Amino acid sequence: MITIKLIREVYNQNGVFGTMHIKDTELKKDIVIKTVERPQLPKGWEKLTPTQRMKYCIPTGQYPMKWKFDTDLDLRFIIRGISTWQIMHFTGSNLSTTNVIKVGTQATSDGNVKGGVQVLKELSEYIKELMLFGFIPITPQYKFFTLEIVNSPTYHEEEFGEDELEIFC
């Protein structure tokens, strides 16, 4: 089973406004992931409030955001922002059933994370496609994925129901 978790976006001194961690639950360590390309942020962006930053985090399709992950899993995908993050391409190999995949997504402008939930659903669909075309081996432990929302300041259980969504292949 692969668990995909939604976490809030992260800002740091380099201006990277998204993060993704792959947790190896057997080795008890995080695999370091690096971004190699991101949208151009304005000078002085670090002084902007989170609300002001959001308009730069949610572009209207003028440019894609490319992430390259320097990990043993060789994960690469392109994220394009419209009204929410949408995963447009995903490739992976050598995925382990012990890995927890956490995906950081930007909330929509009205402050909810429905878009993040949609991203996770789309990610699961891409994983299914990779299985279909043989990029990920179809084995019994890959029969379903658990999608879980965690650490979201705008998450409301009464609005979204259960905090785990099982996507069956």
Feature names for model-found ranges:
Residues 1-169:
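Cell wall/extracellular polymer interaction/catalysis modules
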